[in-house]
């Protein structure tokens, strides 16, 4: 709102660095700095009052720290002190002319309005654009396809950072928004966290939930993945021991079912009869055993079948007993499955400890 009081524009030619206007209006305290225009001249407009048409308005300029009167205005000398002054007539004259002719350098310039002389620093700061960088973590569920923002962080960028560098760093995310975004995907809807290096310290890590898989064995029993791994390791151990027994024992058998059958028949037969066939290889011709072994496979089951046929012709064993032994040796029973708590230990047994193969076979055929 413009003041109804008459206004007057005070001017100073270009040259100094800073000029302050003071006078009776501020009790000579030097509180009104003048504004420097693009040409380098100084000017300021303020309302003036006069008690009577003959009253005077006293003022003076502080030029770069020195109190100086201007030669372009009227001068009054009071006790050796020079001060400038204007009257009501000077104000009316400047208003009619539209501009003052006192200073040639500033002729034709618009008269400045009463505005804040110094722009506050707070307003300067408010005009500056503030830059922010948004960091998001987006969680995606593969089953439903739903995407949700897991976390979001807003970081204010310092003024020294170049905006183009920030655009190159962040770019555009999958959701079309600017900022650094990490997408998390999972199959079962469980929160999983991938590497979020820039700000992982500011966010708690998401605990990973493992869904334990189950497998079904040949017997229809469901086992966990951990017990299945333990079972496979036991089978590998059994295979290694079987290979060692084949290399060392030659024609010795490692089947646990045949050992159990032989032990039962051995308990039934008297010890005197079993002693007669302690070394059966001396009574059976070597040529007959060798010829039969060539026709069968190298596996232990083939050897057992060959030797059973040889004793059937030599000793005259019952046909039913021979077929029974053949069927048991040809079809290996399924091995018991071990668990994590009670692993299967039957593979560590060695039939050689309980007696020779021919000794047991002689007892069965007798």
UniProtKB/Swiss-Prot annotation:
Cross-link (Glycyl lysine isopeptide (Lys-Gly) (interchain with G-Cter in ubiquitin)): 314
Annotated keywords: Cell membrane, Isopeptide bond, Membrane, Phosphoprotein, Ubl conjugation
Topology versus the membrane: Peripheral membrane protein
Gene3D superfamilies in the cross-refs: Immunoglobulins
The organism's place on the tree of life at top rank: Eukaryota
Modified residues (Phosphoserine): 160, 288
One of the protein's GO biological processes: signal transduction
One CC-aspect GO term: nucleus
Pfam hit, one: AMPK1_CBM
Subcellular location: Cell membrane
InterPro entries listed in its UniProt record: AMPK1_CBM, CRP1_MDG1_kinase, Ig-like_fold, Ig_E-set
Biased composition (Basic and acidic residues): 265-284
Molecular function terms, GO-annotated: protein kinase binding
Biased composition (Acidic residues): 233-247
SUPFAM superfamilies listed in its UniProt record: E set domains
Residue list for modification Phosphothreonine: 216
Region (Disordered): 159-180, 217-366
PANTHER family: 5'-AMP-ACTIVATED PROTEIN KINASE , BETA SUBUNIT (PTHR10343), CRUCIFORM DNA-RECOGNIZING PROTEIN 1-RELATED (PTHR10343:SF81)
Homology family: Belongs to the CRP1/MDG1 family.
Function: Involved in G-protein mediated signal transduction and in the regulation of polarized cell growth in pheromone-induced cells.
Protein name, per record: Signal transduction protein MDG1
Provenance organism: Saccharomyces cerevisiae (strain JAY291) (Baker's yeast)
């Amino acid at each position: 709102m413009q003041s109804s009081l008459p206004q007057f524009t005070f001017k100073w030619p270009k040259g100094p660095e800073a000029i302050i206007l003071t006078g009776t209006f501020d009790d000579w305290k030097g509180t009104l700095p003048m504004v420097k225009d693009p040409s380098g001249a100084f000017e300021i407009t303020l309302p003036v009052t006069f008690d009577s048409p003959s009253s005077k308005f006293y003022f003076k300029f502080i030029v770069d720290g020195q109190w100086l009167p201007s030669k372009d205005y009227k001068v009054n000398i009071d006790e050796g002190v020079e001060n400038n002054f204007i009257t009501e007539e000077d104000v009316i004259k400047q208003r009619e002319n539209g501009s003052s002719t006192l200073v040639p350098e500033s002729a034709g310039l618009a008269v400045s309005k009463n505005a804040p002389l110094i722009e506050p620093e707070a307003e300067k700061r408010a005009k500056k654009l503030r830059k922010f960088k948004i960091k998001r973590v987006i969680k995606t569920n593969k089953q439903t396809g739903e995407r949700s923002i897991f976390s979001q962080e807003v970081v204010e960028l310092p003024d020294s950072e170049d905006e183009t560098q920030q655009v190159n760093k962040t770019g555009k995310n999958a959701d079309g928004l600017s900022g650094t975004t990490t997408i998390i995907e999972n199959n079962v809807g469980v929160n999983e966290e991938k590497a979020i290096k820039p700000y992982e310290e500011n966010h708690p890590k998401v605990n990973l939930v493992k869904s334990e898989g189950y497998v079904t064995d040949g017997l229809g029993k469901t086992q966990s993945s951990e017990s299945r791994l333990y079972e496979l390791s036991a089978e590998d151990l059994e295979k290694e021991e079987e290979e060692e027994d084949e290399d060392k024992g030659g024609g010795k058998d490692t089947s646990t079912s045949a050992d159990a059958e032989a032990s039962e028949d051995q308990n039934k037969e008297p010890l005197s009869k079993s002693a007669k066939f302690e070394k059966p290889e001396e009574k059976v011709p070597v040529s007959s055993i060798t010829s039969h072994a060539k026709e069968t496979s190298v596996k232990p089951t083939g050897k057992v079948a060959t030797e059973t046929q040889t004793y059937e012709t030599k000793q005259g064993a019952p046909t039913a007993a021979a077929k029974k032994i053949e069927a048991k040796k040809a079809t290996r029973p399924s091995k018991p499955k071990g668990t994590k708590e009670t692993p299967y230990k039957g593979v560590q047994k060695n039939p050689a400890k309980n007696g020779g193969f021919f000794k047991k076979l002689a007892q069965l055929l007798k």
